[in-house]
């Protein structure tokens, strides 16, 4: 089975759109517009924040559907940033097109998550060493049963965190297709199995990277505590995630 099974119709009547061609259906960047390593926040505004605050000579390279991508340099190394939108279906589109059409080899997701583990604090940064999910996406695309990050990227992030004094926790996250869970059953079940937090994209990233032979890692800042009910405000979120973003960028240039 060839994945993804794209079903839009071309002008030539072939009935398929290849994601090996540029621009792709969802990215209007030119050939060579992306670096080999991409930081991937969910929020397009966070992509802009990364570009404006951390990158030198950052240029907007894609803006289809308001999903923004930039390329610039960080400490002299070329790095790109590309938003994924929310959830696995959206993230899967951008991950696939970046890897297949634009020569991207590494994607580091930099996002936020809700805390499942009672002893995990708000603002804690977590590197996802695995992902479990209620989505069928990994099975549909033929991904391995175990969804894990690139060992090299994970080791690099841990090394950079230690060198820069960043407290980095590691563990499994739950990638959910449902933001508004109808009850706490899933949280209690996953907490019992040692899952640290819940988010909505990592399983897709790890699954597609495995199928495509690419490297991937997720870094998450804990912004909502589903045990205590604590939440960070929008302003607190922005200030808090900068430490994670710098860790992601330093990992990107150190690998």
Question: Which residues fall in each region the model found?
Answer:
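Metabolite-binding pocket within alpha/beta catalytic cores that recognizes anionic/polar moieties
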Residues: 17-156
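Flexible, glycine/charged-enriched surface loops at secondary-structure junctions
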Residues: 56-63, 165-171, 255
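Generic non-transmembrane alpha-helical segments
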Residues: 156-164, 208, 247-254
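Zn-dependent metallopeptidase/amidohydrolase metal-coordination segment
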Residues: 203-236
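His/Asp/Glu-rich mid-to-C-terminal helical/loop segments that flank catalytic regions of hydrolases
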Residues: 228-255
């Amino acid at each position: 089975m060839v994945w993804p099974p794209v079903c839009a119709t071309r002008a030539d009547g072939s009935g398929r759109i290849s994601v090996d061609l540029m621009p792709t259906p969802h990215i209007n960047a030119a050939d060579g517009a992306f670096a080999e390593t991409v930081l991937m926040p969910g929020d397009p505004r966070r992509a802009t924040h990364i570009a404006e605050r951390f990158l030198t000579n950052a240029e907007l390279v894609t803006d289809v559907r308001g999903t923004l991508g930039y390329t610039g340099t960080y400490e002299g190394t070329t790095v790109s940033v590309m938003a994924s939108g929310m959830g696995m279906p959206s993230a899967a589109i951008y991950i696939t097109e970046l890897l297949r059409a634009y020569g991207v080899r590494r994607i580091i997701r930099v996002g936020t998550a809700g805390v499942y583990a009672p002893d995990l604090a708000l603002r804690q940064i977590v590197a996802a060493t695995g992902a479990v999910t209620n989505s069928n996406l990994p099975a549909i695309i033929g991904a391995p049963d175990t969804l894990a990050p690139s060992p090299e990227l994970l080791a690099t992030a841990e090394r950079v965190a230690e060198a820069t004094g960043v407290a980095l926790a590691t563990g499994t996250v739950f990638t959910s297709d449902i933001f508004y869970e109808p009850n706490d059953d899933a949280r209690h079940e996953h907490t019992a199995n040692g899952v640290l937090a819940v988010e909505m994209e990592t399983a897709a990233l790890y699954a597609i990277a495995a199928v495509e032979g690419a490297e991937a890692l997720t870094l998450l800042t804990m912004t909502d505590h589903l045990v205590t009910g604590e939440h960070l405000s929008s302003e607190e979120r922005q200030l808090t995630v900068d430490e994670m973003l710098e860790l992601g960028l330093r990992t990107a240039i150190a690998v």
